[in-house]
From Swiss-Prot:
Pathway recorded for this protein: Polyol metabolism; glycerol degradation via glycerol kinase pathway; sn-glycerol 3-phosphate from glycerol: step 1/1
Listed name of the protein: Glycerol kinase
Organism in which the protein naturally occurs: Acidovorax sp. (strain JS42)
Reactions catalysed: glycerol + ATP = sn-glycerol 3-phosphate + ADP + H(+)
Top class in the EC scheme: transferase
Xref: CDD domains: FGGY_EcGK_like
The organism's taxonomic lineage, starting at the top: Bacteria, Pseudomonadati, Pseudomonadota, Betaproteobacteria, Burkholderiales
Keywords carried by this UniProt record: ATP-binding, Glycerol metabolism, Kinase, Nucleotide-binding, Transferase
Length: 498
């Protein structure tokens, strides 16, 4: 039996999963990652803790699987994107905590870039909107605020990387300073047309090129693990940012295929093939995970509050005592009784981009019960995702493509059958849940398997991918469209005047 080891380094935890060559989970291990909040709006991780927890889970997963390093054909890495690490090349020690993707300290630098009129150039080169979310301005902040960092960077003494680069550096004993195209595309410094760091953008943000890692396709030779770490060397063959890895793990390899990850928020990506498509609907264009040399792209949009609305029902309203109870409560009524919830607790993300919107519950009557509110809360996840998919399809059609014909789903909330059926009803297309819902880690394993010859092509991976359940629409389109119109009316009410 051939095995693949996926390292899945996330915002709140580090995980490792051993897969067999059929893509089935053999063993897994997980450790929580401490969050550091130095002041409001700032979020950091200790890079040494990222490394400690990740290597510990890798050892644990191999032990649970009962296999030695020589049974593992290759390692794949997937990671929280945009999080920024800066370290000393000689010592391998970080010069500061990692600045996490949620961190907003670089907002003044982003505002300055917008005011100077750089938005169009940055979007044309990178596919991204100027935002503190991305790595470029985080790295700029580190160079400007860590004593001696800029001089050391210009002297070639420091290395920058997203979390994948940091892990590869540690895994290879400092031999390789590399990243993949999908992670590089989240820095605001990478030209997604040429697949290279962009000198104009590096100069604009005053980033020395000597800092930057080599960029490789997502299925490549990223080096090998130091023999002392896992009991023998293992080739590192696959790397991709978490959302692109999930798209790959869902076997969405061709233009028009899309996936939605239902987590705390929702992340939707649609593959656009070799077509770089600038969104007219507030979506990002990003590099997809690439198995070959040619650039491939995806459109991306995110919903801020997805499964988090269920946590709010539990912790805020105390309507349920455990998240698992929400489906039964919502199913105790035939519909929401006209209640609409817009969970704009932190504004609305794509495709609305209304940061000032606030949450609303409308359509209340004397007959409204907590069950109606629970159902409206659950349905709000589907409404937001439907609005996002409609925006993606509009962009695709405008660029000469076809609208999305089915949506593949993963993430914690995709196990909720009521939500998935309502999602299919709103979209008017099938919603498909895979047999293996750990698609983010699976994508990294697939990429590693391609690079190491376990799989011959993505066609082989498409044949391996299996659906666990297919939800087909049961609602007439006229009814679904009427519901979406009511949703859009509720969204308009969530944006307060003033």
């Amino acid at each position: 039996m051939t095995y693949l080891l996926a390292l899945d380094q996330g915002t709140s935890s580090s995980r490792s999963i051993v897969f067999d060559e059929r893509g089935h989970i053999v063993a897994q291990a997980q450790l929580e990652l401490p969050q550091i909040y130095p002041q409001p709006g700032w979020v950091e991780h200790d890079p040494l803790e990222i490394w400690r927890t990740q290597i510990a889970t890798a050892r644990d997963a191999l032990a649970k699987a009962g296999i030695a390093a020589n049974a593992v054909r290759a390692v794949g890495i997937t990671n929280q994107r945009e999080t920024t690490v800066l370290w000393n090349r000689k010592t391998g020690q970080p010069v500061h905590h990692a600045i996490v993707w949620q961190d907003r300290r670089a907002e003044p630098a982003c505002a300055q870039l917008r005011e100077q009129g750089h938005a169009a150039t940055i979007q044309a080169k990178t596919g991204l909107l100027i935002d503190a979310y991305f790595s470029g301005t985080k790295l700029q902040w580190l160079l400007d605020h860590v004593p001696g960092a800029r001089d050391a960077a210009e002297a070639g003494e420091l290395a920058f990387g997203t979390v994948d680069s940091w892990l590869i550096w540690q895994l290879t004993g400092g031999k390789r300073h590399v990243t993949d195209v999908s992670n590089a595309s989240r820095t605001m410094l990478f030209n997604v047309h040429t697949n290279q760091w962009d000198d104009e953008l590096l100069q604009l943000l005053r980033i020395p090129r000597a800092l930057m890692p080599e960029v490789l396709p997502s299925a490549s030779d990223f080096g090998a693990t130091d023999a002392a770490l896992l009991g023998g060397p293992i080739a590192i063959g696959g790397v991709a940012g978490d959302q692109q890895s999930a798209l790959f793990g869902q076997a969405c390899f061709t233009a028009g295929m899309a996936k939605n990850t239902y987590g705390t928020g929702c992340f939707m990506l649609m593959h656009t093939g070799s077509r770089f498509q600038k969104s007219e609907n507030g979506l990002l264009t990003t590099s997809a995970a690439q198995a070959g040399q040619s650039p491939e792209y995806a459109m991306e949009g995110s919903v801020f509050v997805g499964g988090a609305v269920v946590q709010w029902l539990r912790d805020g309203l105390r309507a349920i005592s455990a998240s698992s109870e929400v489906q039964a409560l919502a199913e105790s009524v035939p519909d929401s009784g006209g209640v609409m919830m817009v969970p704009a607790f932190t504004g609305l993300g794509a495709p609305y981009w209304k940061p000032d919107a606030r949450g609303t519950i409308t359509g209340l009557t004397r007959g409204t019960t907590i069950a109606h509110i629970a159902r409206a809360a659950l349905e709000s996840i589907a409404y937001q995702s439907a609005a996002l998919l409609a925006a993606m399809s509009r962009d695709a059609v405008a660029a000469g493509g076809a609208p999305v014909s089915e949506l593949r789903v993963d993430g914690g909330a995709c196990v909720n059958d009521l939500l998935m059926q309502f999602q299919a009803d709103l979209l008017g297309i099938p919603v498909v849940r895979p047999a293996v819902v750990e698609t983010t880690a699976l994508g990294a394993a697939y990429l590693a398997g391609l690079a190491s010859g376990v799989y011959a092509s993505t066609d082989e991976l498409s044949a391996l991918w299996q659906a666990e359940r297919r939800f087909t629409p049961t609602l007439p389109r006229s009814q679904a469209e009427a519901l979406m119109a009511r949703w859009e009316h509720a969204v308009a009410q969530a944006v307060l005047p003033g």
